[in-house]
């Protein structure tokens, strides 16, 4: 059963200059949109009203959202529609692979809505998408951004990890104190355990997680989330500014200045993340392809450093 969406009716605040982006336009943008329509694919870029859609789609980058466009939950920060989803589309995995091939993607990000109505939470569809991508465009690296799978997490994670995506992303979204109002359908430590389990099952898979700031969190709370992530051996941290999608969603508590993001990034790097992306416009899949290359290079550099240290 869906949780009720907190009704705030808070008017959207005027964004500072560092948040503003150009309106999407251009032939490449139009071509990407047309391709997604033709293959009957949803994208989180559109459904979540991502501010970077113009830049990404112009570069023919898109984050595909599988399992439909309707979520069984109603988080206070998310613009994806809530309700009873349609049945799973058996053709969707191949359509995702066809889109990746047609766009010539070197790296693809695949996410989904929450599907609490399904016995496996949608895990089998993630596996089928990964398998279709490996068959159709084997050189494309695969990043998945999954939900928490609620009470089905153990079986779901084992199934997906066995399919061997290159990056497993699951966002913590915010600090634990704000979960009851911002992410009421989820549990902070369950999400943390999910990522810890991925790394335990297959240490070669990169793990990634992100949080939003500007929801009323304290800096020390953000630092604690970083520590929790490192305890779970998460490789890559993303941080971005929360933006209120509609007046019905949670209000922006504050617009975090770029210098504060720089400070957060420096602290995160000192805590041992392989890679950190922290800017007002950072989103989970923003520059994901370039970041995957950096992530791989950072791991190789770390392994080389360890190999160079003589055994005690």
UniProtKB/Swiss-Prot annotation:
GO terms for molecular function: 4 iron, 4 sulfur cluster binding; lipoate synthase activity; metal ion binding. It is found in: Cytoplasm. Residues 57-274 form the Radical SAM core domain. The keyword Cytoplasm applies. Its EC number is 2.8.1.8. Pathway: Protein modification; protein lipoylation via endogenous pathway; protein N(6)-(lipoyl)lysine from octanoyl-[acyl-carrier-protein]: step 2/2. Its main location: cytoplasm. Pfam families: LIAS_N (PF16881), Radical_SAM (PF04055). Binds 2 [4Fe-4S] clusters per subunit. One cluster is coordinated with 3 cysteines and an exchangeable S-adenosyl-L-methionine. [4Fe-4S] cluster 2 binds at residues 71, 75, 78. Its cofactor is [4Fe-4S] cluster. Keywords: 4Fe-4S, Cytoplasm, Iron, Iron-sulfur, Metal-binding, S-adenosyl-L-methionine, Transferase. [4Fe-4S] cluster 1 binds at residues 45, 50, 56, 285. Belongs to the radical SAM superfamily. Lipoyl synthase family. NCBIfam families: lipA (TIGR00510), PRK05481.1 (NF004019), PRK12928.1 (NF009544). This is Lipoyl synthase. It comes from Rhizorhabdus wittichii (strain DSM 6014 / CCUG 31198 / JCM 15750 / NBRC 105917 / EY 4224 / RW1). The lineage of its organism: Bacteria, Pseudomonadati, Pseudomonadota, Alphaproteobacteria, Sphingomonadales. The gene is lipA.
């Amino acid at each position: 059963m869906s949780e009720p969406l907190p009704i705030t009716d808070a008017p959207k605040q005027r964004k500072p200059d560092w948040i503003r982006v150009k309106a999407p336009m251009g032939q490449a943008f139009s071509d990407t949109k047309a391709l997604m329509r033709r293959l009957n694919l949803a994208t989180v870029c559109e459904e979540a009203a991502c501010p970077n859609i113009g830049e990404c789609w112009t570069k023919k980058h898109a984050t595909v959202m599988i399992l439909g466009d309707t979520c069984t939950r109603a988080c206070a920060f998310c613009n994806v529609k809530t309700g009873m989803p349609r049945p799973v589309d058996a053709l969707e995995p191949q359509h995702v692979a066809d889109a990746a091939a047609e766009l010539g993607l070197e790296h693809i990000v695949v996410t989904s809505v929450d599907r609490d109505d399904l016995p496996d939470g949608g895990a089998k569809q993630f596996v089928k998408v990964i398998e279709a991508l490996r068959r159709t465009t084997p050189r494309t690296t695969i990043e998945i951004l999954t939900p928490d799978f609620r009470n089905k997490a153990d079986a779901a994670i084992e199934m997906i990890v066995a399919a061997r995506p290159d990056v497993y992303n699951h966002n913590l979204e915010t600090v634990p104190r704000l979960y009851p109002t911002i992410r009421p359908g989820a549990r902070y430590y369950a999400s943390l355990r999910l990522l810890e389990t991925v790394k335990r099952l297959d240490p070669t898979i990169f793990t990634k997680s992100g949080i939003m700031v500007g929801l009323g969190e304290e800096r020390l709370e953000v630092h604690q989330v970083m520590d929790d992530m490192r305890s779970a051996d998460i490789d890559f941290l993303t941080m971005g500014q929360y933006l209120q999608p509609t007046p019905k969603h949670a209000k922006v508590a504050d617009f975090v200045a770029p210098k504060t993001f720089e400070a957060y990034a420096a602290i995160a790097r000192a805590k041992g993340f392989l890679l950190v992306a922290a800017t007002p416009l950072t989103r989970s899949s923003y520059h994901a392809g370039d970041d995957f290359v950096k992530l791989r290079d950072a791991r190789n550099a770390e392994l080389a450093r360890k190999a160079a240290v003589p055994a005690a």
